[in-house]
Amino acid sequence: VVCQDKQLTKDEYHKLLGKAKMVFSANTQETLGISPYEGILVGAMPLVPDRLSYTEMYDDMWKYDSRWTTSYASYQINKEKLVNMIKDDMQNYDNKLPKLEELKQKLTDMYFSATNLLNTIHSYGEKENKETKEKSRKISLTV
């Protein structure tokens, strides 16, 4: 188990991440969840709290009860549950790999790719162009 308590360069971070089987988050503030996703890309399974963006992005099998890490005191109370969950996940790593691949694809498609956003913007542009052309046609017919 590695806790990052020192500054790493991006290269050092990615090398360490490439050796990991799990990426654990106890974040109480997170907007995108990039660290667990980076881990998933190199085959590390995520274990994230059921809060923040993680609630929407991750299935239950990758989440733990968010109350377990809302504070150091709550972590101390729930430490055994969390340790048991980590042990269970690590022992079942090989069995979880197919689900990890599914998760990687889901996150890539839904949250870490511009394809959906670009398609949506493009469809709005097409709709706008169609409406503009229709208005122009009506104006030219009345003139």
Language model features: what each stretch is:
Residues T70-L141:
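A charged, aromatic-enriched C-terminal amphipathic alpha-helix characteristic of glycosyltransferases
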Residues M45-V48:
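Short hydrophobic beta-strand element within catalytic cores of glycosyltransferases
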Residues V23-F24:
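A short hydrophobic beta-strand element within the catalytic core of glycosyltransferases
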Residues V1-Q7:
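Nucleotide-activated donor-binding/catalytic signature segment of Leloir-type glycosyltransferases, i.e.
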Residues H14-A20:
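Short alpha-helical donor nucleotide-sugar binding micro-motif in glycosyltransferases
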Residues H14, Y37-L41, T55:
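Short alpha-helical segment that forms part of, or immediately flanks, the ligand-binding pocket
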Residues D50-S66:
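Short acidic/histidine- and often glycine-rich active-site loop of Leloir-type glycosyltransferases
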Residues N27-T28:
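Aromatic "clamp/platform" in nucleotide-sugar-dependent glycosyltransferases that forms part
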